[in-house]
Each structure stands twice: as C-alpha cells, then as structure tokens.
Amino acid sequence: MRLKKLDIQTIKKEKLVQICFYAGILLAFFGSLHPWFLWPLGTLYPLPSGLLIGTAMLISKTTKDNWFTNDHFLAPVMGYVAISTYMLVINETNINGYIVNVFHTAIFYSIFRLKTEKMEAFMTFLCKVMGGLLLVSIPAFFLYLVGFPFVGVDAVYGDDLYSYTNYFLFMIDDRTLWAFFPRFSSVFLEPGHLGTAATLLLSTQFGKWKRWYNIVLLVALLHTFSLAAYVIYVVVIFLKLWVQRKQFIGKLIMMVAFISTIVVGSFFYNNGENLLHDLILIRLEVEDGEMAGNNRVTEDFDTDFEKLCESSAVIFGKKRENPEFGNSGYKVFIYENGIVGTILMLIFYIASLGKIRDRRATASAFILALLGFIVRGYPLWYSNYLTYYDLAHEAPPLPDDAGKKKKEKEK
C-alpha cells in the first residue's frame, strides 16, 4: 500500500512539473508577442514566467524523471548573459531592466536544461494552445467583417506607437479601420508578428499539418497577408523536405508553377482589384530600384542608419532617442547594438544551437533565424527562439519503415 501511495505522489509531482513549466513557457512565448491581455504586465512578464519555471525545476529534482538533465547548457547560458548584459548597458537600461534580465536568464537556462523529447512535446502543446486561441479569433474576425456588432474599446500600446479598436477576440489597427479587408492580427500587435509566429510553429509540425490546430495556424497565416511570413513559409517547406532527405525538385517546379498561376491570375481577376494584388503583389513592384514592399524602416531611419555606419558609433551602436513606428529588422538591431552586439548575438546562437544531432536540421534552424533577423530583428523573442531551438535539435530522420511505425504509434 505504501508503494502504491508513493506512485500516486510521484505522478502528481510530475504533473505539477508539467503544469508549472508549460504555464511559465507559455507566458514567455505570448509575452514576447505582446497580446492585449498581457499589456498590463509590459516587460515584466518574465517575473511570473521565471517563478513558474523555477518551481517546475525545483519539483522536478525530487522526481524519478527529472525533466532538466541536458548537460549542454553552460556555453549557451554564458552566451546569453554576455549579449543580454551588453544590450542593457548600451541601451542605458535602469536597474529594473537588470532585475528582469535575471528572470530571462532563468527562463533560457531552463530551455537549455530541458530534455529534447520534453521540448518536442511542449511545442506540440504550444501549437494546440495557439490553434485553440485562433479557432475562436478567426470566426469572430469574419463575423466582424460581415457586420456583426462586436463591442470594442480604444486601445493604445507603446507610447502611442500602436492604436487599435480592441474587440477582445481580435483587434483592428486604427490605420485600417475603414479598409475593406483589414489584415488579421488576432489579439497581437501586428499581422506580421502573428504570421511569423504561425509559420515558425508550423515548421515544428512538418508531416502533421493535417491536424486541426495546424490547419488553424495555416488559415491564420494566410489571412495576415504578411509578405515576410509567406516567404518564410515557402522556405520552411523546402528546408523541411531537405532535412528529411526527400526529393523536392519536382515539388519546387510545381510550387513555382502554382504561385505563377496565382500571381498572373490576380492581375486579371476583377481588373487587379483584389486582396492578393492590393495587399501582397503591389508590394513587389520595383520603383527607382527599390521594391515597394521593402519598408522595414522609414526613410528618416534609413538616413540615420547610413550616418551611423559612416561613424565609429557603429562599433557599439547607440540608443534611439525617439523610436518611430514602422522600424524593424536587422538595421534596427545593428543601430541599437552595433557590430559588437551583432557578433555577440551570433556567438550566442552558435553556442545554443550548435549541439548537432543532424547537420541539416541545425543548418535549417540557422537559415530561418537569419531570415527572421533580417525581417524582424528580434532574435531573443521567445516566439522566435523556441522554434529555432527545437528545430536545431531535431534527430536525423528515421528509415522509412521505422518512420511509418512511429507515425502509427502517434496516431
């Protein structure tokens, strides 16, 4: 009887570890995407997240199946401490920033210590949670488009950088309030943030895209009309085929033909007056040697960036005195953190993603991280980093027979 009682207690402890860790990492993931319901926490979301994860780690030590036994953690933690401390110093952060960074460090430490199979299970859970949220948000958004009277309130975020009408299940950017079809961002700040997050989550679920939560993620991705997310999604498809040692030349030809048909059709359908043409293709037009959709930064910021590159300040970067709306991508990161910060970030990524189980998987994670850095410039956002880390540590693909047996077990 005593043994039976002990087994029950062990099960309860392991379940508590799962609840605390999942809740903590979910909070970190969503906190980095800034949904409206986490705005009150602001940049303090790592505090409750870190406490939950710390609790999970302490309890896990007392169980037979300790979740946090990965021994490749020292170099990644040192790399994170180096880049995060550098960024705090360069951007003249107050003492609160250093306190919050202690909790960020604890969160990253838990990620590096977590067993690979536990991370894979969590990523599937995360996709289900995100899919569940969007499963409610997407229908509500379409009901709004056909005139359903939702109650909305004015919402402002980030010193008036963002202004919305918040309908609670989704938000509408005030700049697109009267648009025929506003881009979908659900409860998050930007369509691009949602699109990129959905794409990266789908990259961890390759071969399982027919499951309900992944279908929902794909539908959400398509309705963000994010050019960057679309491009990354196509790259993900071919990277995953390459990682799994599958022939993709034929698929590449088919996809090019399919995309070409859609593009040509959009120019003729309704004389070019359609969503695909107006929200995506028009941004690919080239004027005066510049692509219309190449608008990651404003002209004023571009001028400031060129001046920075011509001065010695580019070595360490400099703080932006008056951050503007509409600036993102690698230029913003280099402006704020300089060449030294960029090198430290690269070292951190090499240290944390460099434990190779499969060279192709690791290479694909680096390629996606580079694309994300160029487009968004937020390499430490949990919504980005978690997926890169999971992808980099994928095991080599199983032989066909073993792979089929594994799929049958999962079903």
Residue ranges and their predicted role:
Residues V81, A121-M171:
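Hydrophobic alpha-helical transmembrane segments
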Residues G289-F325, I339-T342:
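TM-adjacent membrane-interface loops and short helices in multi-pass inner/ER membrane proteins
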Residues R2-K64, A82-M87, L368-L371, S383-D390:
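N-terminal signal-anchor transmembrane segment
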Residues I53-M57, A365-F373, P379-K411:
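Transmembrane alpha-helices of multi-pass inner-membrane enzymes
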Residues A56-K61, V89-L143, M345-A351, K355:
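Transmembrane alpha-helical segments and their membrane-water interfaces
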Residues P139-L145, Q244-E287, E306, E310:
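A membrane-periplasm/extracellular boundary helix in multi-pass inner-membrane enzymes
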Residues V234-L241, G250-I253, E336-I374, H393-A395:
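Hydrophobic transmembrane alpha-helices and their immediate junctions
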Residues C127-F148, T176-F225, V231-W242:
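Alpha-helical transmembrane segments of multi-pass inner-membrane proteins
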